[in-house]
């Protein structure tokens, strides 16, 4: 009887033990629900921020966000995959996010700008990005770490859940675009490196052959390359603020509808200053404008307020180096953060004009114009309006329209020097001005600001003086004369 009772008690104890373990197992599963939900939410927000920060997915679909979330959770399942794969990719995306949110996905143009940017330009570029973009960038690695630490602490292993694996498999099979920003960055970087190598190889090449200049009226041909000047912010093009007194009153020809070849200096000028392949939208450095002019026996000069990292480090510096004489205000390229004024080019320009020379000359003046940040461009020039009389929202706009007026003043001074040279040395001239590209116009509740545009169809300011070069402009919409007698 005692033996039977002992067996019954033993059986009850075993059943009770199993029952207690079952309750303990269920309690453990319940305790993991909230941490798992927290990890999923963190991963989802991180995935969403990564997608919009890439610049390629401004409004990502729910499926795409789920795909990003699952990718993050899977890569977080292993310590090695987290630290050696997910974390580096996360930091790379976070680094690019401020740029991607405001200027679009990685491309040749932005990678080229990175190669050609000095410290001052980098500072000004970063300052024009809204604080909210930096907050999103900082949030990405924080969210990634939160979901990882939560999963580790509570022993959450998503890869063991069959439903999770099935959903992940279906989503991955459907679409896998997350690697596109990275692939585009690598592709653009390799393209830049390849282009630099080609620039070095063809630096001395010239496929124009011998050229002749017939029926030329002028002794000196001057081109002023502007910077970041939107057409619709010039009074000469109808803007109500009178910020172009010289352009609006000088005798010349105004081109309306000329479009920039790219969204930044390098992307634009490498096409505008060569004879490009219009089908592939690629430059032909062996057929450059400088080489064409030199082939006609004209002496060439390039005076620049832009930095020169190295003779062949960027397409623009390579094109400039083809000139017979070059002068750069910024010595040392990327390591020079001095904010030079465009007016600092004028003494060198006067020196070039005073030099005794036989034959014709071609002179390029590459100015900083209205390059962001525009307020830094006018440290030596008065603003059109007093800031205290304006709503703070229009503070940067005041700087921008004032920088255009400064460029107009620069053009007047160049013109006056050329006129003086006519009287002194009897050398006639042709003067041309155009901006390399425009800027996009954005605004929020607090301010109106400008940034690099995402498309290549950016209208730039074009003004031609005393020449018939408009015959070369195949995509101009309208040509009209200004103040002709």
UniProtKB/Swiss-Prot annotation:
Enzyme class, first EC level, given as a word: transferase
GO molecular function: phosphotransferase activity, phosphate group as acceptor
Chief site of localization: membrane
Keywords: Cell membrane, Membrane, Transferase, Transmembrane, Transmembrane helix
Superkingdom of the source species: Bacteria
Membrane-related topology note: Multi-pass membrane protein
InterPro entries: Alkaline_phosphatase_core_sf, PEA_transferase, Sulfatase_N
Membrane-spanning intervals of the chain: 33-53, 55-75, 81-101, 125-145
Species of the source: Haemophilus influenzae (strain ATCC 51907 / DSM 11121 / KW20 / Rd)
Compartments, record wording: Cell membrane
SS bond partners: none
Pfam family, one: Sulfatase
Protein name per the record: Putative phosphoethanolamine transferase HI_1064
An annotated GO cellular component: plasma membrane
GO biological process, one term: lipopolysaccharide core region biosynthetic process
Protein family according to the UniProt entry: Belongs to the phosphoethanolamine transferase family.
